């Protein structure tokens, strides 16, 4: 593997000194870029794009050609794991992801098998190894998965949900069934993420997109417990250096202390959290990633630059901060505004790393 030329993202996650605050964007390979739209049209549909390792590599690299980003993230989807379990993933126009065979009974859960990442998910591993090779050491490659709870919400609901009625009914009326599902998913995610590391991922992120829908105690029981299990089972060293792990629960600002106890290296923050407060609470234990509101990228560029300065000042001096948005970039953002955001982070953060 080529030697890493820019490792400030990995260094910041491990709280080692950096020259400027590293920055990348969730969904940086996405629909706001005209070149992404062209490649997706070539693929035909979203899952065909994910399953073609050469095109997945191409869209992963596209934002790096435009912007001075400090990390690349595998182009894939969190629902690859339930898809590999045979649920029949498809995308409904305007509806988002759907499953032909929801996992909403204990019998359906018992029948689920744990997918082999090198077989049913081999297309993801091929994408990881291709991207790592094509990066040629420019920046680190982030691998990722959805959290067991978040994957389970889609599997039980049969797709996206605003109320989470079916999975919450299972959680409170049939908790043993849900725990069986979450346990299988945790085992699947451990294998999946470790295979990503074996194929070249240099950092890992667990996206708990819907953990914030849970009550205080239910979050610990149904989400955090299974993310803890995953962290305990992960490969933490590869290529002679640590593989940092970032946990991100959207709406998880209440639980930062509990999340920091898992042994992860960093916590992702959404835009509802004050980063200065987060650093006071858990900054002695973990690095922090975030956390500008993605909608701020619709603002005039001077306002974006002002907000970047506000967040950098909130975090303050020293390492341990990876700048990002508080969630994925919106599809209608002007690419020039994204570029101004990235430049502002690097330019304004130098003063905090003397």
Swiss-Prot record:
Pathway connected to this protein: Porphyrin-containing compound metabolism; protoporphyrin-IX biosynthesis; coproporphyrinogen-III from 5-aminolevulinate: step 4/4
Gene3D superfamilies recorded for this chain?
A: 3.20.20.210
Report the locations given in the UniProt record. Cytoplasm
- Give coiled-coil spans as residue ranges: none
Q: Which GO terms describe its molecular function?
A: uroporphyrinogen decarboxylase activity
Q: Which reaction does it catalyse?
A: uroporphyrinogen III + 4 H(+) = coproporphyrinogen III + 4 CO2
Q: List the signal peptide residues.
A: none
| Enzyme Commission (EC) number | 4.1.1.37
Q: Which GO terms describe its biological process?
A: protoporphyrinogen IX biosynthetic process from glutamate
Cellular component terms, GO, for this chain's entry? cytosol
**Where is the site described as Transition state stabilizer found in this chain?**
77
Quaternary structure, per UniProt, is:
Homodimer.
HAMAP family named among the record's database cross-references: URO_D
Listed PANTHER family: METHYLTETRAHYDROFOLATE:HOMOCYSTEINE METHYLTRANSFERASE RELATED, UROPORPHYRINOGEN DECARBOXYLASE
Q: What is this protein called?
A: Uroporphyrinogen decarboxylase
Q: Which gene encodes it?
A: hemE
């Amino acid at each position: 593997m080529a030697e890493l030329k820019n490792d400030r993202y990995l260094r910041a996650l491990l709280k080692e000194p950096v020259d400027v605050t590293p920055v990348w964007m969730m969904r940086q390979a996405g629909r706001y870029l005209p070149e992404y739209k062209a490649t997706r049209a070539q693929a035909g549909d979203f899952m065909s794009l994910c399953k073609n390792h050469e095109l997945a590599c191409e869209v992963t690299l596209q934002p790096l050609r435009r912007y001075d980003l400090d990390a690349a993230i595998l182009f894939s989807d969190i629902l690859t794991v339930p898809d590999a379990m045979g649920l029949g993933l498809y995308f409904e126009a305007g509806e988002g992801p759907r499953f032909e065979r929801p996992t909403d009974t204990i019998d359906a859960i018992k029948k689920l098998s744990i997918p082999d990442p090198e077989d049913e998910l081999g297309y993801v591993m091929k994408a990881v190894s291709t991207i790592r090779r094509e990066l040629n050491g420019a920046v680190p490659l982030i691998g990722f998965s959805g959290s067991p709870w978040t994957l389970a919400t889609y599997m039980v609901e049969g797709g996206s949900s605003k109320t989470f009625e079916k999975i919450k009914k299972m959680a409170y009326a049939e908790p043993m069934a849900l725990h069986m599902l979450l346990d299988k998913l945790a085992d699947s995610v451990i294998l999946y993420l470790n295979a990503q590391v074996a194929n070249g991922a240099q950092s890992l992120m667990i996206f708990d997109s819907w953990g914030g829908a849970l009550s205080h105690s239910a979050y610990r029981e149904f989400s955090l417990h299974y993310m803890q299990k995953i962290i305990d089972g992960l490969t933490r060293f590869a290529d002679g250096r640590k593989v940092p792990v970032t946990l991100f629960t959207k709406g998880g600002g209440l639980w930062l202390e509990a999340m920091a106890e898992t042994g992860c290296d960093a916590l992702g923050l959404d835009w509802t959290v004050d980063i200065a407060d987060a650093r006071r609470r858990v900054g002695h234990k973990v690095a922090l990633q975030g956390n500008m509101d993605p909608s701020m990228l619709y603002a005039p560029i001077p306002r974006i630059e002002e907000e970047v300065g506000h967040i950098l000042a909130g975090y303050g001096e020293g390492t341990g901060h990876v700048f990002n948005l508080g969630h994925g970039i919106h599809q209608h953002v002007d690419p020039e505004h994204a570029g101004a955001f990235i430049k502002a982070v690097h330019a304004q953060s130098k003063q905090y790393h003397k």
